[in-house]
């Protein structure tokens, strides 16, 4: 297993000195110690592989995943409590320590459940190959994916081989006995792949988080970990009781009846998988390089698995594709960690033992190895990208709108995972399908969240107007997404109207009610922003105020001036909308309508047996979704196509008349009005000056520019104005030449900050061209 459930239970074999760890007698030389450690590692990993094979038969025949996880967590907690005696810490627990205990319990709970799920749906040998040492290989794969340049360096080629080896295991290395459990091959693949990836990510996450804690001595950390195991056991016991009630009501509770002999075997398996395995790892990591350690461990697992398959049968747990995956993984590790690539081993401290044990990862010193990945100073590409991720999370939390999107995204994903897990548990296709539908909603929320974060970035040379238009693009994409959903539901409804299918309403009503509640929370969360976008409410905390602060560097204190401007233009409130939030709101509204339709149709079917209620409700919902999303697509498309905003379009005549009435203006050659995003309207004008203004260009153009800018900002909500002045020229015969050969081509670029008075226009930029 790629990470221990409770690292505290195997530290009793170490000394408490500064060097710590298991020590051999001085009578052994270094080569002798290495050989003995390799033999000890080889046989211990083989015994672990056999233990996982026995665990597979328990999971497939007599014990569920929840029950097996409970018993294993119980025995692990007992071993830990006996060794660490954590009750001495209970009387002096601090809030920070309680928080760490909760973290330990959650990690332990999820890691052991996903591990047992991987054993059941992928098989023991495949799970070992695809999970061992991934806390070291996953960051390397992640770094290679971010760098690109596939197959260009040894590091990228090795990463590709690792990904192929890992992916082949859940794709082809499934157990053939799973067909008797009522799962299809696609279900086995998805469940196995999901469990394996989540398990490996949790192990990596646990090591990263716990390693960053500074809680004093390793003994204190071990006691906290022991208490975390006890909390995990209690939570799993509650899950087991709930599972027992559910299976008892359905008459299938015999699967979780465990005998004393089976409990004894599970206790031995737990000791081997967690205590003995980690103790051997701790000893081996101090004397062996990562290259040798990983090769010996994985080779032992495959060889002992083959030996067991010779007596038990290959079809039960050992697919031939595992050998190919093993070859890919071993060769990739050799490429990535060999001396030829200048990869120097470094230590990755164990997450529970205060840094006494270490796992050797990688530190490429450059050259053809693809650059530094991780080094002792915390630099390198992988750490760099993790720092970027932390900064993005900080940006999300800082802004109220993005914080609400992120919060609801997490709630949506949690409900999706619970629904998926319960659907797999009960083998309910309806629950699994609804969970997949919620995944599309989560995708829409993720798109909106990304757009909300990017839109706050400052303008630069490449994006001179900033990143605000990403919100418009997000709204347009989500609108197209909703059109696709509406058309799909419409086609399915018509098909069901023509050929009504048999409908199983089991658990459908419960799931629909829960989904309705979740979506209702989201609707109320985003309704304020959505109402604001249509003119409801005068607050600016989630709309233009944040963008103005980001793009122009002004505080919210300037809103008072802005509020003096908005009443003059009655149509401005209509334009103050966040199409990004509109897209999220419409997604939630569509999902809520879907839940309402399912609730209504389920009640009609259960009460009156009228099965056509389901396609009729779906048909009505698809039409409502289609009609509600059309305004969003129309508005975002007009913005992306740079159409003249509707309030300005209806006032073009007044704008032209005002500009022509200014002293010094001879003609308007061309004008363009467009919206960059929700709160930024832009005007570009080419104005021809008369003879008087042309002869005194600097003073007159400044006066004309101020008049036009003030008028457009105050009366028409135009925030940026770019004006090009063309003089009216005369030739030697005193005939007007228009703007054929201008002597002065004077561009005036004026940024109008709408939370300031019109006097700020004096900060405009002047460019002269001959």
Swiss-Prot record:
InterPro entries noted in UniProt: Cation_efflux, Cation_efflux_TMD_sf, Msc2-like
Extracellular compartment segments: 58-62, 118-123, 176-184, 246-262, 313-316, 426-434, 491-507, 614
Region (Disordered): 532-566, 751-770
Regions of this protein lying in the Cytoplasmic compartment: 1-36, 84-100, 147-154, 206-224, 284-291, 338-404, 456-469, 529-592, 636-770
Recorded GO MF terms: metal ion binding; zinc ion transmembrane transporter activity
Recorded topology in the membrane: Multi-pass membrane protein
A GO-annotated cellular component: Golgi apparatus
SUPFAM superfamilies, alphabetized: Cation efflux protein transmembrane domain-like
Residue ranges crossing the lipid bilayer per the database entry: 37-57, 63-83, 101-117, 124-146, 155-175, 185-205, 225-245, 263-283, 292-312, 317-337, 405-425, 435-455, 470-490, 508-528, 593-613, 615-635
Keywords noted in UniProt: Ion transport, Membrane, Metal-binding, Transmembrane, Transmembrane helix, Transport, Zinc, Zinc transport
Principal location: membrane
Compartments (UniProt record): Membrane
One GO process term, biological-process aspect: intracellular zinc ion homeostasis
Similarity remark: Belongs to the cation diffusion facilitator (CDF) transporter (TC 2.A.4) family. SLC30A subfamily.
Protein role: May be involved in zinc transport from the cytoplasm to either intracellular organelles or extracellular spaces.
Protein name (record): Probable zinc transporter protein DDB_G0291141
């Amino acid at each position: 297993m790629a990470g221990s459930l409770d690292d505290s239970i195997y530290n009793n074999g170490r000394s408490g000195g500064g060097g710590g760890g298991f020590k051999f007698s001085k009578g052994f030389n270094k080569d002798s110690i290495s050989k003995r450690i390799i033999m000890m590692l080889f046989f211990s990993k083989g015994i672990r592989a056999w233990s996982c094979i026995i665990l597979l038969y328990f999971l497939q025949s007599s014990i569920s995943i929840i029950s097996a996880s409970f018993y294993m967590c119980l025995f692990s907690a007992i071993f830990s409590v006996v060794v660490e005696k954590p009750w001495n810490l209970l009387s002096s627990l601090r809030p920070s320590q309680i928080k760490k205990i909760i973290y330990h319990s959650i990690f332990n709970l999820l890691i052991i459940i996903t591990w047992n799920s991987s054993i059941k749906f992928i098989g023991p040998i495949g799970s070992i190959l695809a999970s061992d040492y991934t806390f070291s290989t996953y960051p390397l794969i992640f770094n290679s994916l971010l760098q690109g340049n596939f197959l260009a360096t040894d590091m990228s080629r090795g990463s590709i081989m690792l990904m192929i080896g890992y992916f082949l295991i859940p794709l082809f290395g499934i157990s053939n006995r799973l067909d008797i459990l009522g799962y299809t091959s696609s279900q086995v693949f998805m469940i196995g792949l999901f469990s394996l990836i989540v398990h490996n990510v949790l192990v990596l996450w646990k090591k990263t988080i716990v390693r960053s804690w500074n809680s004093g001595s390793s003994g204190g950390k071990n006691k906290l970990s022991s208490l975390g195991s006890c909390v995990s056991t209690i939570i799993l016991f509650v899950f087991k009781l709930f599972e027992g009630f559910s299976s008892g009501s359905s008459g299938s509770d015999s699967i979780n009846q465990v005998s004393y002999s089976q409990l004894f075997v599970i206790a031995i398996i737990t000791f081997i998988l967690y205590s003995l395995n980690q103790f051997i790892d701790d000893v081996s990591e101090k004397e062996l390089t990562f290259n040798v350690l990983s090769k010996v461990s994985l080779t032992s697992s495959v060889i002992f698995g083959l030996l067991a398959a010779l007596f038990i049968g290959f079809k039960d747990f050992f697919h031939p594709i595992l050998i190919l995956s093993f070859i890919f993984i071993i060769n990739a590790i050799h490429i990535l960690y060999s001396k030829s690539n200048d990869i120097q081993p470094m230590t990755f401290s164990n997450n529970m033992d205060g840094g006494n044990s270490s796992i050797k990862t990688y530190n490429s010193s450059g050259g053809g190895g693809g650059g530094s990945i991780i080094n002792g100073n915390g630099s390198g590409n992988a750490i760099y990208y993790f720092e970027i991720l932390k900064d993005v999370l900080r940006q999300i939390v800082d802004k109220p709108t993005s914080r609400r999107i992120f919060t609801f995204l997490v709630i949506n994903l949690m409900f999706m995972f619970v629904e998926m897990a319960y659907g797999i548990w009960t083998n309910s296709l309806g629950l699994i399908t609804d969970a997949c539908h919620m995944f599309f909603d989560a995708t829409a929320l993720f798109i909106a969240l990304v757009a909300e974060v990017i839109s706050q970035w400052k303008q630069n040379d490449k994006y001179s107007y900033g990143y605000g238009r990403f919100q418009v693009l997000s709204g347009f994409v989500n609108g197209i997404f909703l059109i696709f959903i509406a058309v799909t539901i419409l086609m399915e409804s018509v098909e069901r109207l023509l050929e009504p299918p048999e409908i199983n309403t089991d658990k459908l009503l419960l799931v629909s009610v829960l989904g309705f509640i979740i979506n209702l929370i989201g609707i109320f969360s985003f309704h304020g922003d959505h109402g604001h976008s249509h003119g409801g409410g005068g607050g600016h905390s989630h709309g233009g105020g944040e963008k103005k602060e980001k793009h122009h560097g002004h505080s919210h204190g300037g809103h008072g001036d802005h509020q003096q401007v908005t009443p003059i233009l009655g149509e401005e409130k209509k334009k103050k909308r966040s199409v990004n939030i509109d897209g999220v709101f419409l997604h939630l509204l569509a999902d809520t309508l879907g839940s309402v339709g399912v609730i209504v149709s389920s009640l009609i079917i259960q009460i009156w047996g009228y099965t056509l209620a389901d396609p009729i409700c779906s048909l009505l919902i698809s039409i409502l979704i289609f009609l509600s999303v059309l305004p969003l697509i129309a508005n975002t498309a007009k913005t992306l196509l740079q159409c003249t905003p509707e309030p300005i379009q209806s006032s073009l005549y007044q704008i032209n008349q005002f500009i022509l009435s200014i002293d010094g203006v001879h003609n308007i050659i061309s004008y363009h009005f467009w919206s960059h995003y929700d709160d930024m309207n832009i005007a570009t004008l080419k104005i021809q000056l008369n003879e008087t203004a042309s002869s005194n260009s600097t003073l007159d153009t400044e006066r004309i520019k101020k008049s036009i800018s003030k008028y457009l900002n105050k009366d028409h909500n135009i925030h940026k104005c770019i004006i090009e002045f063309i003089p009216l020229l005369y030739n030697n015969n005193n005939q007007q030449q228009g703007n054929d050969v201008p002597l002065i081509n004077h561009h005036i670029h004026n940024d109008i900050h709408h939370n300031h008075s019109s006097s700020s226009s004096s900060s405009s930029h002047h460019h002269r061209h001959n």
